[in-house]
Amino acid sequence: MSSARLLESQTSDEDNEDIERRPHQSHSRSCSNNTTPTHPPHPMVRKGGVARRICLIGGALFLLLVALCYLTLSGDTRLGGSEDSEEGSHHGLDSMNFRPLNETVHICSESYEDRRQFMQDKPQSDYVQLPVIYFVTPTYPRREQIPELTRLAHTLLHIPRLHWLVADDQEKCNDYMDTLLYRFGMPFTHMVSPMPSKFRNEKPAPRGVANRRAALQWIRQHNLTNGILYFGDDDNTYDLRLFSEIRKTQRVSMFPVGLIADYGVSGPVVRKGKVVAFLDSWVAGRRWPVDMAGFAVNLEYMAQYPYVNMPYKPGYEEDLFLRSIGLQMNLIEPRGNNCTEILVWHTQTKSKKLGMVRLESKYLDDRSNLGALLHNLKLMGVTSTTESEGRNALISKNGRENPHSKILS
């Protein structure tokens, strides 16, 4: 019962009690004008009033106890309705109305046209009945960004009925990336969704969360309930069989991921065809200790949970996302031959700082290919040119290094 109803019931009972008291009060006033001494109320009247008070207090305590039990036992699937306030503060949601806080999403470009003629030696028409895989890739500007997206794209080019959601962690759209994604010929959406500034100074920073949240928002805005959601980082390595496996997902499917932490693997423990536990070297109280690449979700199932989201809490993104969709152990579908095969690897490219070439701007004209080449590399975020910093550009000929001015002048 709500507190408003409880207050209403208490007020109405007290009013009834006042009505019962009024005859005695008026009798006392009328007797005060006479010399005849007044008599106290009948003992049964006093007992009745006390009994009512006891019943009211007991009822209120009982309702309070029921409410506390309900709040304790009920599993709130909304991120922001968390088990403790500290955890809730990391969700990036307004605790009052569960709206995203200070998040920006901008669609740079998208295409729903599949310009690939053949996939796996079959025409597109052979695949029209397959559910679409929405492959979400968070990415961020760095020297390796374009090479890794290019490598990933040449895996995805083999997969029919796939829409690639590329979410970049920066403020402005990258025109070069727009051109690159369009050139691949598969359906895609390119969006920018920078991490809110309040989380950027955290160590470790919740990298990729704003991008995945942006993709979830895009799916929600398009009312997509038919298809499969998969979070695929740009530096992972994917077996083509993975996509056939996750396309069969009815609710939530799971499978092991290779090269994770100390064990070299993270994934479900399966007995008699059912997931019963998890193997992972970092549990840390997580109900679902799995890697982001180790599960897929059916959009029809996810649509049952309007508060689905992902928290800004490093290490707990997967766990709290899966909690937000009400996942239970008996709903998990093991894939990869009962989780005995590795279909995705958590490979990581060694990152280096932005390259720097010291070269006067006058040599970046059309006298050689270097002007256009270095311009393209700058657009990719791989290297940059400067006239005052970095190592002076050397050009070799016949095994000998020469100042660039000697060759280009």
UniProtKB/Swiss-Prot annotation:
Modified residues (Phosphothreonine): T11
Membrane topology summary: Single-pass type II membrane protein
EC number: 2.4.1.135
This protein's record includes keyword Ubl conjugation: no
Active site, renumbered: E318 (proton acceptor)
SUPFAM superfamilies on file: Nucleotide-diphospho-sugar transferases (SSF53448)
Catalytic activity: 3-O-(beta-D-galactosyl-(1->3)-beta-D-galactosyl-(1->4)-beta-D-xylosyl)-L-seryl-[protein] + UDP-alpha-D-glucuronate = 3-O-(beta-D-GlcA-(1->3)-beta-D-Gal-(1->3)-beta-D-Gal-(1->4)-beta-D-Xyl)-L-seryl-[protein] + UDP + H(+)
Region listing for Disordered, in residue ranges: 1-45, 389-409
Cytoplasmic topological segments: 1-53
Manganese listed as a keyword: yes
Record's keyword terms, sorted: Glycoprotein, Golgi apparatus, Manganese, Membrane, Metal-binding, Phosphoprotein, Signal-anchor, Transferase, Transmembrane, Transmembrane helix
Positions bearing Phosphoserine: S9, S12, S32
Positions in the Lumenal compartment: 74-409
Enzyme class: transferase
Ranges annotated as spanning the membrane: 54-73
Domain of life, per lineage: Eukaryota
Molecular functions (GO terms): asioloorosomucoid beta-1,3-glucuronosyltransferase activity; galactosyl beta-1,3 N-acetylgalactosamine beta-1,3-glucuronosyltransferase activity; galactosylgalactosylxylosylprotein 3-beta-glucuronosyltransferase activity; glucuronosyltransferase activity; metal ion binding; N-acetyllactosamine beta-1,3-glucuronosyltransferase activity
Stored InterPro entries: Glyco_trans_43, Nucleotide-diphossugar_trans
Pathway info: Protein modification; protein glycosylation
Family that this chain belongs to: Belongs to the glycosyltransferase 43 family.
Protein name: Galactosylgalactosylxylosylprotein 3-beta-glucuronosyltransferase S
Organism the protein comes from: Drosophila melanogaster
Gene: GlcAT-S
